[in-house]
Amino acid sequence: MSEHIEVSRKGAVNIVRMNRMEKKNALTRAMYAAMADAIRTADVDDEVRVHLLLGGEGVFSAGNDLGDFMAIAMGGEHGNEVFEFMDAMIRARKPVVTGVDGIAVGIGTTIHFNCDLTIATARSSFTTPFLDLGLTPEFASSVVAPIMMGHQRAFALLALGEALSGEEAREAGLVWKIVEPGQLESEAMATAERLAQKPPEALAIARDLLMGDRDERMDLCMREARLFGERLRSDEARQAFQSFMNRKASKG
């Protein structure tokens, strides 16, 4: 279990919180593994009805940890933990609610295409700088995003790298409700508790129907992952990452 993932229970709600604020909740392989385990363990617990995924104040997640990315790009690691997390999210029988305040970058954005209800603050920002790093979309976003928000808006988000504010994300269908920052966690919990009061089998079936074919979605994730992996090891991506790290270093 990663020290940066906090798992707790409130009634029938399984709460999974990212807590690596000093790195803006950038996700390491250990964090992915811990989240996958937390979701899978609670998903087979009859006392749990809903999963709730949270970040911190002003930060949901900055996306993948760049150190892990660089290790994979240099050919030393494979990073299967992220796919285990995707699989756990997609195959969860119980609904997943997310609460977002502040930045949601890369997979910090695409995760919400695989959740059921996302509550966010107006100051939240959803962005996917994949192409700027020589990469391509992931987590089934290449198909789910155009269905959810239309090709133009999805292409602007996933290819152009255009950020969506909290309200713009709500209008696009990525977010269900906008609340004030001080109300985010209480509203997210209240929503999860409302869901938890529903008949559990009916609730699980409803999620299954609305998610569609889980195998097909995971197959899509794996196709995206193969392309993502090829890109990650490409000269183009290595140069883009190096330029990014140089810019970051120059800013101190």
Regions found by a protein language model. Give the residues of each.
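C-terminal alpha-helix plus adjacent terminal tail
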Residues: M1-G11, F60, G161-E167, G182, ...
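Glycine- (often His-adjacent) and acidic-residue-rich active-site loop
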Residues: R40, G55-R91, A104, E216
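Conserved CoA-thioester-binding segment of acyl-CoA-metabolizing enzymes
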Residues: M1-G56
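Crotonase-fold acyl-CoA enzyme core
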Residues: A88-L203, S234, Q239
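Phosphate-coordinating loops and pocket residues in cytosolic domains that bind phosphorylated ligands
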Residues: A26-R29, A62, A71, D132, ...
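Hydrophobic/aromatic residues within transmembrane alpha-helices
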Residues: V16, L53, D65, I111-F113, ...
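Hydrophobic alpha-helical membrane-association signature
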Residues: M31-A34, E81, I111, L184, ...
